[in-house]
């Protein structure tokens, strides 16, 4: 293991490029020389080995003569899954505990081990279940994994999934958020010893289990170890066999429509159960949460974005005020369709009018809107889906900032199975699906980001329909094959990602503007000559008359503009690391300054920004001050 590190360092010192292909050659050569299994020298073990030597054997590490610049290059070589922080932020997804859902959609899975619409085999869900759905434990596990893969974790976006957030009790909401912040504030990163596969160079899988008994006492942070024991003592299972058997009887009844998901969840997780006992201490006050938030303003791992998901009918001024106090900056909202007939026959229990109101309220409160849009619903057609999505992207009442657009999946236990068996629903063919998605990409405007085109379901869980995880790549190939010169403008396609950007070539594009029923929106973006995007800002100029007429519902007044998002791309760099990433060249500050000029010229007296907890200090340095739910600046 050490020799591979030394070989990489020597190559870098000679000015050579060590890409993945070159690294594989180095690993294979060293495996042959040592007569070792190349899997024991895999890339995923190199960085933890380097980190352990630097931390625990400083004299040995000093002998490698690694200065700051050489270490930066080495980490670029060893970093696993570099795209995870390519957007400039390290993302941690956490899942709330199973809970009754206010909806009952026809296509929705009914996995009793999960909150509604999620499956226990999804990666984030499996991690959550192994961590008892505890927010502190989930963050600790992901923070550890990101650190061991070499990712910077100064700037964290927390994504809280689990169905309709507002369905949970307010005390649980405050506790869940408080524990997310607490884990980051505590720097709850486990040592290398906590992962026996990474603890020692050359370890085999057979030896990994035995190392657990030899791990140092501080392998897990004390809070993590103590909390795991608390759940174990309460009778909360983490063993797969126990988890499966614990819900088996209820799951069978739900799958054959004898009793519903909500009734079963109450029996499994309500009073008189181990989860009922745990629920007694899963509550916090807003004061406790705000204490953790204040600490996080200057913590090692700062929250620069916080996302919850909800339904349009749950979006009210009161709900938005609460989630803003919790620290949220973005809302994921299940829309699925704008066709009222499709909404009705798929039993969404919402109206298009409710969707319109939810978008207007969310915008006026300053939230980023991340919508879910589903193709191939019961009753849908490919041409109808194309028209519906185009309306969603071009009609002012909607026009989300970000979207997950994915095909409906047939999951065992959902009520859609009966429709399939009766011949009332069929999945689109691959050709139909690619055709719809290719058209959807083309009509997606420059201010919108398509974050996903497929749910993270295991192919084993999908009964029929698309099971290919590389659906986006197939869609992009379809677009290229069309040869019609269609331009893709959506954000994700244009992100500079892990590549750098020549800052001298960047220009500030202010041409993207659009009207909604309640705001005039401006999308400012730093772009390369090729149209790649290095950063952007979302500026809302609210309709003064509307704000004045709804003053009792809104937290702002009519002469206040709103910055809803500032994002600068490039590999996430650690605080104080003056590397070449676009984030370190004042692009964000220049965007904010220009937004202030535009708002002032439009006649607004003040400008608000929906700051995350961990970006408050940044905006204070730019002249903003704390003001209610936002930070504000006089214009």
Regions inferred by a protein language model and the residue ranges of each:
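Flexible, acidic/Gly-rich N-terminal and inter-domain linker regions that tether
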Residues: 1-138, 142-282, 446
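Conserved acetyl-CoA-binding loop-helix of GNAT-fold acetyltransferases
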Residues: 579-598
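C-terminal scaffold of the Radical SAM
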Residues: 184-185, 277-283, 314, 318-324, ...
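Conserved active-site alpha-helix within GNAT-family acetyltransferase domains
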Residues: 611-630
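Conserved non-cysteine loop/helix-boundary elements of the Radical SAM core domain that shape
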Residues: 120-138, 158-182, 196-370, 374-431, ...
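Non-catalytic positions within long, well-ordered alpha-helices that form the structural scaffold/packing
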Residues: 324, 393-396, 596, 600, ...
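Conserved GNAT acetyl-CoA-binding A-motif
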Residues: 597-611
């Amino acid at each position: 293991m050490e020799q591979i590190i030394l070989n990489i360092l020597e190559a870098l010192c000679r000015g050579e490029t060590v890409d993945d292909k070159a690294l594989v050659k180095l690993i294979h050569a060293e495996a042959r020389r040592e007569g070792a299994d190349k899997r024991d020298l895999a890339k995923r073990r190199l960085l933890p080995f380097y980190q352990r030597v630097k931390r625990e054997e400083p004299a040995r590490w000093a002998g490698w003569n690694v200065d700051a610049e050489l270490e930066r290059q080495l980490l670029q070589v060893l970093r696993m899954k570099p795209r995870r922080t390519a957007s400039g932020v390290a993302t941690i997804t956490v899942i709330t505990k199973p809970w009754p859902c206010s909806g009952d959609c026809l296509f929705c899975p009914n996995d009793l081990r999960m909150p509604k619409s999620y499956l226990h085999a999804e990666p984030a869900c499996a991690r959550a279940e192994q961590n008892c759905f505890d927010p502190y434990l989930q963050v600790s596990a992901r923070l550890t994994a990101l650190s061991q893969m070499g990712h910077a974790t100064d700037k964290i976006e927390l994504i809280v999934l689990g169905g309709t957030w507002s369905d949970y009790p307010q005390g649980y909401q405050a506790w869940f958020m408080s524990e997310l912040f607490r884990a980051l504030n505590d720097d709850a990163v486990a040592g290398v010893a906590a992962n026996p596969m990474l603890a020692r160079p050359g370890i085999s899988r057979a030896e990994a289990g035995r190392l657990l008994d030899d791990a140092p006492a501080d392998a897990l942070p004390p809070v993590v170890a103590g909390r795991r024991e608390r759940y174990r003592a309460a009778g909360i299972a983490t063993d797969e066999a126990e988890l499966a058997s614990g819900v088996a009887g209820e799951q069978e009844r739900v799958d054959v429509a004898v009793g519903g998901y909500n009734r079963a969840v109450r029996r499994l997780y309500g009073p008189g159960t181990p989860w009922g006992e745990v629920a007694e201490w899963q509550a916090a006050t807003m004061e406790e949460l705000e204490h953790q938030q204040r600490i996080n303003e200057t913590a090692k791992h700062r929250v620069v974005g916080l996302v919850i998901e909800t339904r349009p009918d749950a979006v009210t001024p009161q709900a938005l005020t609460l989630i803003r106090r919790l620290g949220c900056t973005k809302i994921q909202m299940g829309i699925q369709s704008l066709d009222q007939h499709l909404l009705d026959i798929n039993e969404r229990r919402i109206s298009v009018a409710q969707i319109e109101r939810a978008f207007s309220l969310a915008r006026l409160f300053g939230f980023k809107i991340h919508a879910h849009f589903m193709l191939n619903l019961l009753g849908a057609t490919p041409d109808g889906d194309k028209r519906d999505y185009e309306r969603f992207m071009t009609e002012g009442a909607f026009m989300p900032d970000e979207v997950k657009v994915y095909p409906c999946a047939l999951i065992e236990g959902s009520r859609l199975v009966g429709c399939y068996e009766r011949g009332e629903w069929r999945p689109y063919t691959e050709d139909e699906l690619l055709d719809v998605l290719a058209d959807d990409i083309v009509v997606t405007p420059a201010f919108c980001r398509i974050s996903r085109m497929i749910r993270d379901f295991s192919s084993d869980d999908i009964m029929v329909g698309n099971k290919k995880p590389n659906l986006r790549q197939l869609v992009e190939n379809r677009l290229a094959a069309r040869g019609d010169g269609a331009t893709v403008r959506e954000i994700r396609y244009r992100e500079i990602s892990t590549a750098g950007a020549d800052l001298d070539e960047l220009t500030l594009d202010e041409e993207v503007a659009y009207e909604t029923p309640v705001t005039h929106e401006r999308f400012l973006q730093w772009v390369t000559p090729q149209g790649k995007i290095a950063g952007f800002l979302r500026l809302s100029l609210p309709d003064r008359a509307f704000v004045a007429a709804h003053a009792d519902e809104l937290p702002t007044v009519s002469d206040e503009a709103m910055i809803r998002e500032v994002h600068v791309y490039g590999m996430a760099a650690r605080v104080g690391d003056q590397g070449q990433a676009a984030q370190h060249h004042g692009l964000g500050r220049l965007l904010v300054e220009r937004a202030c000029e535009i708002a002032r010229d439009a006649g607004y007296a003040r400008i608000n920004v929906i700051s995350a907890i961990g970006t408050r200090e940044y905006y204070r340095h730019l002249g903003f001050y704390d003001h209610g739910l936002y930070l504000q600046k006089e214009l």
